[in-house]
UniProtKB/Swiss-Prot annotation:
<dbReference type="InterPro" id="IPR002220">
    <property type="entry name" value="DapA-like"/>
</dbReference>
<comment type="pathway">
    <text>Amino-acid biosynthesis; L-lysine biosynthesis via DAP pathway; (S)-tetrahydrodipicolinate from L-aspartate: step 3/4.</text>
</comment>
<comment type="function">
    <text>Catalyzes the condensation of (S)-aspartate-beta-semialdehyde [(S)-ASA] and pyruvate to 4-hydroxy-tetrahydrodipicolinate (HTPA).</text>
</comment>
<keyword id="KW-0028">Amino-acid biosynthesis</keyword>
<feature type="binding site">
    <location>
        <position position="57"/>
    </location>
    <ligand>
        <name>pyruvate</name>
    </ligand>
</feature>
<dbReference type="GO" id="GO:0005829">
    <property type="term" value="C:cytosol"/>
</dbReference>
<keyword id="KW-0704">Schiff base</keyword>
<dbReference type="InterPro" id="IPR020625">
    <property type="entry name" value="Schiff_base-form_aldolases_AS"/>
</dbReference>
<dbReference type="InterPro" id="IPR005263">
    <property type="entry name" value="DapA"/>
</dbReference>
<feature type="active site" description="Schiff-base intermediate with substrate">
    <location>
        <position position="173"/>
    </location>
</feature>
<feature type="binding site">
    <location>
        <position position="213"/>
    </location>
    <ligand>
        <name>pyruvate</name>
    </ligand>
</feature>
<dbReference type="GO" id="GO:0009089">
    <property type="term" value="P:lysine biosynthetic process via diaminopimelate"/>
</dbReference>
<feature type="site" description="Part of a proton relay during catalysis">
    <location>
        <position position="119"/>
    </location>
</feature>
<feature type="site" description="Part of a proton relay during catalysis">
    <location>
        <position position="56"/>
    </location>
</feature>
<keyword id="KW-0963">Cytoplasm</keyword>
<dbReference type="Pfam" id="PF00701">
    <property type="entry name" value="DHDPS"/>
</dbReference>
<dbReference type="InterPro" id="IPR020624">
    <property type="entry name" value="Schiff_base-form_aldolases_CS"/>
</dbReference>
Length: 301
């Protein structure tokens, strides 16, 4: 638990450092339950206190509800109460999101991550009604995922304030990156705030975020924990040093995308989770060599 400089709200529901975990597949492209359990145990034993399953990095668009729930149950059996399990329950279909939320709750999820409906481009009232409907489907706390590059439509500040009044909306995963606007919203809404973009993890802590939901955490879980701990304890110079150390991984993620980065990087570390499903593709040999270089620079290979 945070006791220093970082914000405390949301820790009991969502933890501090989460990894948006990949969904492992075997050589035939089928769900690999054992690999998922192994990866979850590895991340938790290296400082991660929360796992997001069936999110964007978990290839939610190309996995079935049955696969999502099977992985959630298996990871729950593996890690127990040693980490919070946040289940992705966001689609651009409100009824489908409700179904996913209820199934995840029954399977043992601790919380839900619900993204702004993508592709449909709903109005702000539509966004509010979507989140309200999903939030009333279970008694699990919800982290609202604001990511305009994927959803096109952002969650407007007024809408966030309305969402904050709903009993089960407890947090925001911010991949919008407008720290200036969010600084006011953090204070006004009382919601727990989580960085949803690895380049901004440290800056977000400085304005009141509780933690971050990371992709590069697959490859550098201990470094992320060390950066968080040093910031929390007031060792800002060390926190900045670690943040700079992570920069090559951030650059690699920008080049490859989160799924391809995480799966290829884990393979280089000896943790096999298979290749992505189409339309995501694995990196080329030259891209893997560039990734190897970046991982060596970061000290995680």
């Amino acid at each position: 638990m945070s006791t220093g400089l970082t914000a405390n709200n949301g820790i009991e529901e969502f933890g501090t450092i989460a990894v948006a975990m990949v969904t492992p597949f075997d050589a035939n492209g089928a769900l690999d339950i054992k690999a998922g359990q192994k990866l979850a145990a590895h991340l938790v034993s290296n400082g991660i206190d929360s796992l997001v399953l069936a999110g964007t990095t978990g290839e939610s668009p190309t996995t079935s509800l049955e696969e999502k729930i099977d992985l959630l149950k298996a990871v729950k059996a593996e890690v127990g109460d040693s980490a919070k399990l946040i289940a992705g329950a966001g689609t651009n279909n409100t009824a489908a999101s409700v179904e996913m939320a209820r199934a995840s709750a029954e399977a043992g999820a601790d919380a839900l991550l619900v993204v702004t409906p993508y592709y449909s481009k709903p109005s702000q009232e539509g966004i509010y009604q979507h989140f309200r409907t999903v939030s009333e489907a279970t008694d699990l706390p919800i982290c609202a995922y604001d990511i305009p590059p994927r959803s096109v439509v952002p969650i407007a500040p007024d809408t966030l304030c309305r969402l904050a009044a709903l009993p089960m909306i407890k947090a925001v995963k911010d991949a919008k990156g407008d720290i200036t606007a969010a600084t006011t919203l953090i204070a006004e809404t009382g919601l727990a705030w989580y960085s949803g973009d690895d380049p901004l993890n440290l800056p977000w802590l400085s304005v009141g975020a509780t933690g971050f939901i990371s992709v590069i955490g697959h490859l550098a879980p201990q470094l992320l924990r060390e950066m968080y701990t040093n910031f929390n304890q007031g060792n800002l110079e060390k926190a900045r040093e670690i943040n700079a150390q992570l920069a090559p991984l951030v650059a690699a993620q920008a080049r490859l995308g989160g799924v391809s980065l995480a799966k290829a990087g884990l393979r280089l570390q000896g943790i096999e989770v298979g290749d992505p499903r189409l339309p995501i593709v694995a990196p080329s040999e030259s891209e893997i060599e560039d990734l190897r270089r970046d991982m060596n620079k970061t000290g995680v290979l």
